[in-house]
């Protein structure tokens, strides 16, 4: 999931319609996209997630909104990295593929690394692909690979020194 979240939104031209979903903190990240859409007079829908929205309300409202969109729409989500991580399965379930969505995130994200030796999961903050870390169970030094398992919701950690 780390490799899908960007910290700066990139404008993708030529889409049928643009969908923007953000909260107060994500607004600054998505502002350049809004300005481009307005200057080009492109069609877009905008959904703002307020402070008083619970995660369950957010999921239900987002699901209803996205299910009513037409094919050819492009989605920008500008939320905290943890919120993006939690919403991604819902977005994919609705039918948006990786090339139809930009996850623009802020803040820290907790990721897991799967140890190839003892098969335990170690949780880390702001994981970097290619970095080394110790397994919390067997204490072996692992090299974090870019292979991500959706089954375990974790990156594969290979033995760093043989």
Label each residue range with its predicted role.
Residues 85, 89-162:
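Cys/His-clustered metal-coordination modules, chiefly Zn-binding fingers
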Residues 1-111:
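FNR/FR-type flavoprotein reductase catalytic core
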């Amino acid at each position: 999931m780390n490799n899908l979240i960007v910290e700066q939104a990139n404008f993708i031209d030529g889409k049928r319609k643009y969908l923007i979903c953000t909260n107060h903190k994500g607004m600054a990240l998505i502002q350049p996209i809004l300005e481009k859409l307005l200057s080009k007079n492109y069609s877009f829908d905008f959904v703002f997630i307020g402070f008083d929205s619970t995660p369950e309300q957010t999921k239900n409202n987002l699901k209803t909104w996205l299910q009513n969109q037409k094919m050819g729409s492009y989605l920008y989500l500008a939320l905290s990295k943890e919120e993006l991580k939690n919403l991604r399965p819902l977005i994919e379930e609705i039918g948006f593929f990786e090339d139809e969505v930009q996850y623009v995130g802020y803040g820290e994200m907790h990721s897991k690394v799967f140890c190839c030796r003892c098969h335990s999961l170690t949780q880390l903050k702001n994981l970097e692909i290619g970095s080394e870390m110790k397994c919390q169970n067997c204490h072996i030094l692992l090299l974090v690979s870019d292979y991500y398992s959706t089954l375990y919701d974790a990156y594969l950690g290979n033995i760093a020194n043989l």
